């Protein structure tokens, strides 16, 4: 199979990359791909954490993180919220960390207006749920009862939207059936979807309980797709393939930093610990994404929907050994029938379980790990009661993921040393930090 310059409709136009010489445009990318749309981006890791923008060759801005390499002069930093010039990068760091991400609706991913019927949700989904219950409305999905519910598509399938409301934990007992405004009923925090008179029984699987709230949050926080957009005017070669992958990885890194800020508990860690975790686990997160996208393919790796590598392309790019290692992970997760809920939770666990030696507050990081482990266990207990060991089996895949990540980092670091492939500041800096 040759490189696929697949058709991408106009809805994807906001994700089209720019040339490697203009990394400042990653600001647009992170605003699109970060779930809350509030994360900033730049050409280097420390400036990405702080909302600064640097050129491709600008030095790192965070002086207290020597593992990033080079302190460099303090540059003038423009605050996004005013026209004043901020001279101190540490001040900007604190500003960005204090800009907590907004709470998201667990049903569609829009900005939540508060907790409605037991769940963080937006006004639109609150009103939809209330109308459905009060009107005793039955819906039927025209497809397979698996429609994706997002802010943009939440009106496309009422049946799947209502099922999503129940799945994330909205409580039908909280809706007043008499349509009278006033005090709220007291109700138990549970869902008995199988007994609901408002659902077609064929649409519901009665044995399953609602998702763990952390898992639901991670599903909503999952970023939009990023496209590789390989240059169709350049002939296929190892340099073209590696340049495409390095550019893609750089843009994915920006998105990962924005995504991490939406993991419950991550933004409460110190800046130094956030940096340490990301510097340690970023490649594991990237590889896990490739693995998940590749589950429905045979012996091919889906680096992006428009960039799929088979064995011949892997050989051409000099990536055969690395890609074979990643395919072993694909095979393992495919045999386990990895679900999206497990994928997003494993990504967060991989970040929290990093092997960094530079953690300041070990107790806080341990607490984050415990919360995420419990979320996975709770999900498996509710969705896979037939396999009580499934959570443990999932966690046992992480050592192989880390081993594969180490191989990938070393391979791309060697490419960096050769100097034949252009790399953005952020990707280059993260390779340095990991090695």
Swiss-Prot record:
Residues 1-64 are annotated as: Disordered. Gene3D superfamilies: Erythroid Transcription Factor GATA-1, subunit A (3.30.50.10), Retinoid X Receptor (1.10.565.10). Pfam families: Hormone_recep, zf-C4. One of its GO terms (cellular component) is nucleoplasm. PROSITE patterns: NR_LBD, NUCLEAR_REC_DBD_1, NUCLEAR_REC_DBD_2. Signal peptide: none annotated. This is Estrogen-related receptor gamma. It comes from Pongo abelii (Sumatran orangutan).
């Amino acid at each position: 199979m040759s490189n696929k310059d697949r058709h991408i409709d106009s809805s994807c136009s906001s994700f089209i990359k720019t040339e490697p010489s203009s990394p400042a445009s990653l600001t647009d990318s992170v605003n699109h791909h970060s779930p809350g749309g509030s994360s900033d981006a730049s050409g280097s890791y420390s400036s990405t954490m702080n909302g600064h923008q640097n050129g491709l060759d600008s030095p790192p801005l965070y002086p207290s993180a020597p593992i990033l390499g080079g302190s460099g002069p303090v540059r003038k930093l423009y605050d996004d919220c005013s026209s004043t010039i901020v001279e101190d990068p540490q001040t900007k760091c604190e500003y960005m960390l204090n800009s907590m991400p907004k709470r998201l609706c667990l049903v569609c991913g829009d900005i939540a207006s508060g907790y409605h019927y037991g769940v963080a949700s937006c006004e639109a989904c609150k009103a939809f749920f209330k109308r459905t219950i009060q009107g005793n409305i039955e819906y039927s999905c025209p497809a397979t009862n698996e429609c994706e519910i997002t802010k943009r598509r939440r009106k496309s399938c009422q049946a799947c939207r209502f099922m999503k409301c129940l799945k994330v934990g909205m409580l039908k007992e909280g809706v007043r059936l008499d349509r009278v405004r006033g005090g709220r009923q007291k109700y138990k925090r549970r869902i008995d979807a199988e007994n609901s008179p408002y659902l077609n029984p064929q649409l519901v699987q009665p044995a399953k309980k609602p998702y763990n709230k952390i898992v639901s949050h991670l599903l909503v926080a999952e970023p939009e797709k990023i496209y590789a957009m390989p240059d169709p005017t350049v002939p296929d070669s190892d340099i073209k393939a590696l340049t495409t992958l390095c550019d893609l990885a750089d843009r994915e890194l920006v998105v990962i930093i924005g995504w991490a800020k939406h993991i419950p508990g991550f933004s409460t860690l110190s800046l130094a610990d956030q940096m340490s975790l990301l510097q340690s686990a970023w490649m594991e997160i990237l590889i896990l994404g490739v693995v998940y996208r590749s589950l429905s393919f045979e012996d091919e790796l889906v680096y992006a929907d428009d960039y799929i590598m088979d064995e011949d392309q892997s050989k051409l790019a000099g990536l055969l050994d690395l890609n074979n290692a990643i395919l072993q992970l694909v095979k393992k997760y495919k045999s386990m029938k990895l679900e999206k809920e497990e994928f997003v939770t494993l990504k967060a666990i991989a970040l929290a379980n990093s092997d960094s030696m530079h953690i300041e507050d070990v107790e806080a990081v341990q607490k984050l790990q415990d919360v995420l482990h419990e979320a996975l266990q709770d999900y498996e207990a509710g969705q896979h009661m037939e396999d009580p060991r499934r959570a443990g089996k999932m966690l046992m895949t992480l050592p192989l993921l880390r081993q594969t990540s180490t191989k990938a980092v070393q391979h791309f670091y060697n490419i960096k040393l050769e100097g034949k492939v252009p790399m953005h500041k952020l990707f280059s800096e993260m390779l340095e930090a990991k090695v």
